[in-house]
Amino acid sequence: MSARGTFDVALEGAVFACVQVHPGHEQAFDDWYGLDHFYSGGVLGPAVLSGKRWFADRRLRESRFVSDDCLHPDPRAGNHLAAYWLTTGGLHGFFSWVRPQLALLRAEGRMFEARSHVIVDGYRAAWPLAHTASSSVDPVAALDHGFGGLFVSYGEPTGAPPVPAEALPPHSLGIVFAPAAGSLDNNSVQTPPGAPGLAFPTASGAAVMTMLFLPARPSSDLAWSRRIAVELSRASGTAPLWGAGFYPIEAGSSSHVARMS
């Protein structure tokens, strides 16, 4: 942000919040997140360009790619996902703001306990993923474009150079992210010290996330998930660990709620 208080229109990073809503609390969660926390804990923060929500029903969660090397303790958890794009300076500005903001919301009784954190972290945008017939949508506009679905993958860096992908869905858009260290800690989200649910765990301590915005809904087929995850790992120079599809949530609609259980 400049001295005049204006913002660049650029993608510096992202806030990624994947949680598992506890059974029987889906509607209450949706009311809370969709009409309060999405804004008070996200969109209204400094340097936020945009935000978007997705969900995963049971079939999608069961069709996730999970490698033998995946260290996540519950890789099929996560039925709700929110992401926020951050402009230049946003990684520092947003997380400096959100830590006390969460404490304030908690003091006002505006948090929701019937959910478990699965992956909640901040990421720095690394590069747009190159692949055949990629979407022409600028990554800055990805959350607002109206893509039909999302596939998220995690991989562990191997040192191998990225290879342009050749077998991803036409007109999809891939963006590679690296973790932004120190974004959140257990104290920020009120979980016990060392409890899982923040950064994606890997043997080396490093994880690369790729978000692939899809022109259509993701398949609930395990072979499809495996193929996409492996292709994304090659294109990001990583060993594939985890890959998951998500359906978009329409703002103001609750049609997805019954499918979250």
Task: Give residue ranges: language-model regions.
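Macromolecular interaction modules
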Residues: 1-261
